[in-house]
Each structure stands twice: as C-alpha cells, then as structure tokens.
Regions:
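M14 metallocarboxypeptidase catalytic domain recognition
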Residues: 6, 19-168
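Bacterial N-terminal signal peptides that target proteins for export
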Residues: 1-7
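Bacterial N-terminal signal peptides
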Residues: 8-16
Length: 168
C-alpha cells in the first residue's frame, strides 16, 4: 500500500471516529413543543397512553410490547376499536390491523367490507346499485404507521392517534 492510500484511510478513519463528537444531539420534544400532546376531553374509562408507559406520552419512544399492550387493553375498554392480528414479525411480534369507528360501524364491519368488495369490479355492478352502496358507506381512511422496523416515530404516533380516536 502506498503512502497516498494510507493517508486517505487515516483521514477517513479519523473522520468516522470524530463524527459522533461533531454531531449535536437534538432536544427532547418537551423543549420543541409548547402545546400539550393529547389535550382534548377524553372518556375516563379508556386508559391514557401514560398508563402503559413508564414515561409521559411523547417524551420518549414506546417499545413494541408497550404499544401491543396498549392496543390489546384498549380493545377491551372500547367498542369503537376492533383489533386483528394478521401476522407476526420476523422477531415473532404480533402485527395488528385496527379498525376504529363508531360502535355501530364496528358491529357492521363485515357488511361494510362486503359492500366495498361489491364496488371493486365495475363490470359486475350497475350505477344505481353502486351509488346506493357508496351513499350507505362511512368514510374510510387507511393509515399505515411504520412499514420499516427501524422507523419508530410512526408506531409511536399511532399510539396517540388510536387513543384520541377511541377516547374523544
């Protein structure tokens, strides 16, 4: 190896070693946001996320078991949520799909899904029937939180959104 290659390696190596020293850590969320997170009027019988965490919601990142624990507890406390475990992660953690709506819509979820499936092929339904189904359906939004295992902010945000939707 010649001197030029050795110098290049030395520079790269010293930069990597010092990069941690040069990077300033970010502030905690309490320093960034003046408004309180989850500051609505909530149903008392539904536990606040802080009940499942060992810190205040928003101060730190919740771990997967805390999120699962909250979801499963909320499914017992509220008739506005249905939890379906659809798979396991590569670490054998449960993966959930949640349906959140009014109690009536949750109890009629199978019919709602059937009506949506009727709309999936325009060749098999006439306009009058399609319009009738559309008029009867609730608004539907698909919200996917964290499709990559190392993206924690989405799953953490889901905790607050779920609570807000079922408890407010």
């Amino acid at each position: 190896m010649n001197i030029k290659n050795l110098l290049t390696l030395a520079i790269v190596f010293s930069t990597v070693l010092n990069s941690e020293i040069l990077i300033e850590p970010t502030s905690y969320s309490k320093d960034l946001y003046a408004a309180k997170i989850l500051s609505s009027t909530y149903i008392d019988s539904i536990d606040h996320p802080n009940e499942f965490l060992d810190f205040n919601y928003g101060d730190r990142v919740a771990n997967p078991s805390q999120i699962s624990n909250a979801i499963l507890n909320w499914s017992q406390q509220s008739n506005r949520i249905k939890v379906v475990e659809y798979a396991k992660s590569h670490e054998n953690r449960p993966l959930y799909a949640l349906f959140i709506s009014s109690a009536d819509n949750i109890s009629n979820l199978d019919q709602i899904k059937e009506n949506i499936s009727q709309l999936s092929d325009a060749r098999k339904i006439n306009d009058q029937k399609a319009n009738s189904i559309i008029d009867s359906l609730p608004a539907i939004a698909w919200m996917a939180y964290s499709i990559h295992g190392n993206e924690t902010s989405g799953a953490d945000a889901a905790l607050g959104i779920i609570y807000h939707l079922i408890a407010s």
